[in-house]
């Protein structure tokens, strides 16, 4: 990660812009809240005014009868002031919290809406799914923090500042002027800190955003990671990024501490100045002691208010930095805007499509031209098939017709009108897309089909699923249409997903139908029926088909052969066949390896299907079936409530063990830190006493105490940064340790764990980023705080009891109220911003899904539907935010009232004791100041400390991950390693169900033996469990009963990492990481370095070297998120090279060539044939040509192996399963 781009992220938006999205209600709330905040702020300087009066009342009238009466009046005024503060504080907090919650929710949904309306190029180049989710969960919390009650608090503090100075000027303008000189220093130190903190926090944010991208990529393709034992690599790149964040964190801590230290130096020097000059004023200008104290306290407390505004400023700056990226996106005008309602809307379209002189290159690779002057005419109502090599630009044609991209030059026309002139939403509504890797959303089957049409009825949805031949398998599911499909549709097999995608397109009833390899993942039976369904809906529609299986395209009216971005031939099947040397004939010849395979060719989904749920889950396994999902959901909240009491402090502290020396040092410095305020209390009492002494003593004492004040300030400058720095190191290291522990734990969980709804990549990413940071508040920060507070308390009590034990005891009885009040205020001050975490996890999953499958969202114009789902999931959050605002407001208001009443009682009691001659007024002040300043010190220290209540919940969720023992842990070093692997595999009496679907038995008593060096093909219908065999062999899951052996040793007894290294997996939807091609191939080595020679050898074997070398950056080309920058065939070849680099003893090919065109398939098949030599190979496939040459063909049906033998044997079994599957194909192709 380059430093450069971290630096760039420190831009911010102007503050007013945060409120850009408020409505009239918000404006009203903000006005009322601000009035409340101003009133509340002025209460504090008014209190100092009353304090001055008290001093004058008690000072000179030592033995006067009037003392109690004068003091009583002042005390009563204090109580009234408290009542006023109560109302003002309530308005301040409640209004600002409510409006903040409302506006943040609005920003969040606007951001998602903007993301959804961006053109596809934006996602190729600028934005990744992880980043969107990170910004929506992390950055909006920072924004909310900057525009909610922190603004109210800020206004309150500023009005304290202004009000204070007005009062100070009225009471003694000269002294005030002199003391004012310290304010610029204060402001400057505050400003400098805000700037540096912003920079550090922006860098930290950027590093974390990249780290959460690593999490999203790794967990989103956990099967690939596990299969290639890539856990270590993921860990090391994650650690590198969190280390960067740690460094920013420490820097931030030190700077904040330095800022506080400098501020306190300025405060205490201001008191020093006031004491010295105030003494002079009493002597020369006849000021009263009360007036001098009033001015001093007012000036300083007003300045303190300014200092207390610094955390608000920090929050504002962090919020402005977070908003910059989000607002930049919100304001980005997409090149192709779905929400733009301008443009033509016709009665209807005929559906004639023309590409005229199109030049085009993908935004992510602008220098590589895909088309240079490409032209193609598709008459309305006809079916045109595009054929050609992988990467020749067939799917690009479809992207251009859908207007995912605009051509660089040339035009795409429909009915002679340029696509750009149509209203985008309307024209996309006329186009139906079914693509090669169908994308489903984490919701029910019904909702997924419903994306095809706004407000579709259940009947329409059922009819569409019948047409797509999906009704049968849906009815078999326990919940039917209400079944949840999981993240990226992982709960369904490839064939099932594809049929739902087709039903979704059918429901749309489009004029133009785009089929991008639409039947490539289906088994023979489904394919025949789906093909019929497609044939039925293709009537009278313009259809564009991209297919590799040439048999699917024979009936097309026009076949266009594309080669390197040019049409080299065009015509019908029979016309093109006449030219024996033509490109089409050559492609066909490649596929006609022999007559039979040719006849069966149509079986794109030939003898088997897109596998049971195993391979597609290379995607990511998430939600389970809906009922279970709901149960699991309830269970986990219950669990978290039960557990939240159970995580002991010692347990968390143990994690900080390595930092004990730092913590001890920090604690000692922190203790010194804690004594500063109580000592300040004594000094202050001494100054009050000095002001009522004889002139010569007054002169001497005021000078002496001034010097002491300055020394106290110097101590603060040393102590604050040191404490903060030490605790930042300890806290930062703890966060870093927890993050890497958790991530390590999660990466090594068994694959089945990710099938649970709460463990989706989105949710885990959010947890790793938010929770780890919160735990820090429980250890370092809270230790630091406790030490400061204990030191303050002890010092305060010693001072108070030495002065006057009677007053001390009475004040002590009352002081807990100040403590409680301080605690409540801080609790509210910190805990206001609603705990957004859990509520947003669900909502971020919606966002995660939509952004991850943005093409599907765009092609079905489902943006508004996604927004609705998102808003629905956010409703409760806003409601609870409002509720919290009201409760916090009441609490905050009451706390002020209590504070003022307590002050009043203290002085009333003190006055009575002075009158009774039990004590003198100096001691009353000393006790009062020592104790109240201790309380102030404690609450002030606490107000700077982050809130630990959320930390407890976070600790529970973190420890739940750390404590969970992975059922199948690849770190486990125990287990045998075989010297020499032959490759005999035996599955004995296997029964198996997926945990998330315990009522669907996948295998019951399945037996299969595979001899070393044999190639075994698994065939069977879609969903019969073929891919599950592959998942079991890699120990993604363990069977419920029975056992699997390798060379006679049970898999569970072998070392897991070693076992996975013996197997090379190539799946149907290859998962590549957002990294270079080189890194993706080298990934096969499982964390060991792969040499350049090995990488090139592997890609040559996989027939990838040629296409890689032809790309501009060659092996250094970045493949994009989920490999989006490469075509299906190119991705697959990179995936095969990755498996080959591993030099595995056992090859697992799960539909490995289903996404390739004839030419690549032949070469890849050759490559696979070469690599298969002397290796045990298990093939899941539906193409007969692939299956026919297998040594053994095993037919999976109803959870058992129904038949096994060679092609010749099985084909001759009368009425056998295999024979009838083959027969099906022959009929299908004829």
Swiss-Prot record:
Residue ranges crossing the lipid bilayer per the database entry: 27-47, 78-98, 154-174, 177-197, 253-273, 286-306, 662-682, 707-727, 798-818, 889-909, 924-944
SMART domains associated with the record: AAA (SM00382)
Keyword field contains Acyltransferase: no
Keywords of the record: ATP-binding, Glycoprotein, Membrane, Nucleotide-binding, Repeat, Transmembrane, Transmembrane helix, Transport
Binding site for ATP 2: 1020-1027
Predominant location category: membrane
Membrane disposition: Multi-pass membrane protein
Any single GO CC term annotated in Swiss-Prot or TrEMBL for this entry: cytosol
Localisation per UniProt entry: Membrane
Domain of life: Eukaryota
SUPFAM superfamilies: ABC transporter transmembrane region, P-loop containing nucleoside triphosphate hydrolases
Sugar attachment sites: 540, 615-616, 759, 1074, 1174, 1227
Gene Ontology molecular function terms on file: ABC-type transporter activity; ATP binding; ATP hydrolysis activity
Pfam families tied to this protein: ABC_membrane (PF00664), ABC_tran (PF00005)
Ranges of residues in domain ABC transporter: 353-589, 985-1223
Biased composition (Low complexity): 603-617
Signal sequence bounds: none
InterPro entries associated with the record: AAA+_ATPase, ABC1_TM_dom, ABC1_TM_sf, ABC_transporter-like_ATP-bd, ABC_transporter-like_CS, P-loop_NTPase, Type_1_exporter
Residue ranges constituting the ABC transmembrane type-1 domain according to the UniProt record: 30-318, 663-950
Keyword Zinc assigned: no
Binding site residues for ATP 1: 388-395
Region spans: Disordered: 602-621
Protein family per UniProt: Belongs to the ABC transporter superfamily. ABCB family. Multidrug resistance exporter (TC 3.A.1.201) subfamily.
The protein's name in its UniProt record: ABC transporter B family member 5
Gene source species: Arabidopsis thaliana
Gene: ABCB5
